[in-house]
Amino acid sequence: MKHLFLLSVALFAAMGADAADVDVKSPDGKLVVSVSDDGGMPGYKVSYDGTVMLERSALGLKTDIADFTSGLIIDKSDESKIDKKYEITRTKTSAVHYTANQLDVVFKKDDGKKMKVTFCVSDNDVAYRYTLLPIEGSDYRCAVVYSEASSFNFPGKTTTFICPQIGPMTGWMRTKPSYEEDYTADAPMNVKSAFGHGYTFPCLFRIGNDGWALVSETGVDAGYCGSHLSDYAEGKGYTVAFPDKGENNGFGSACAAVTV
């Protein structure tokens, strides 16, 4: 299962980890991701050069196998290095040299069911994805993902440059959402989205005078559903939201089916 979220960070100007946190740093040591299981709930936070860019934010999936949003502990973690080069056409950069540090964190429930979260941290970017691990002694080989707990909880001073998601089967020839709605620059986070459906990726945030963060999904193929961000919730931030059931004229499911 691959559902990758990208948090790209740029800092203008200059956090320690809790004792139980598992940390991974960028190659230059400035970008730090701290992963924890506080209260049985998986989460992470991001700082850059000592400045908090993302407060503790939720991780996890609700599936037909188990609820991987609570009742979890960190079972193990492994860190490795990534250093690869590749070329790509039709982009602004044709030759890419990607270096990052990777952290695999396995969360476990009391009954032994496990979820792995893989973080890749380069000098300016954080990406993560989920993997549901095989269940020993069971016949589970696939799962339905009902929803994600994945959230982005920015500091309170953050303002937004984000496009509201509009309802399905509206607009010209009932083609919306077409991801072309107007947005307000530098808007406060606690203002409801214009249509009550959250916001469309990519989403740009300004963390006061400390820097900027761009949030988007990437690496999503036909094996998973596209998503967007929910409206802001105090203390939780923005949560990953699945498609509206009315999209695509009601055909198909708004959930995701994945292999285990």
Predicted features by range, described:
Residues 21-260:
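N-terminal accessory beta-strand-rich subdomains and adjacent acidic, glycine-rich linkers
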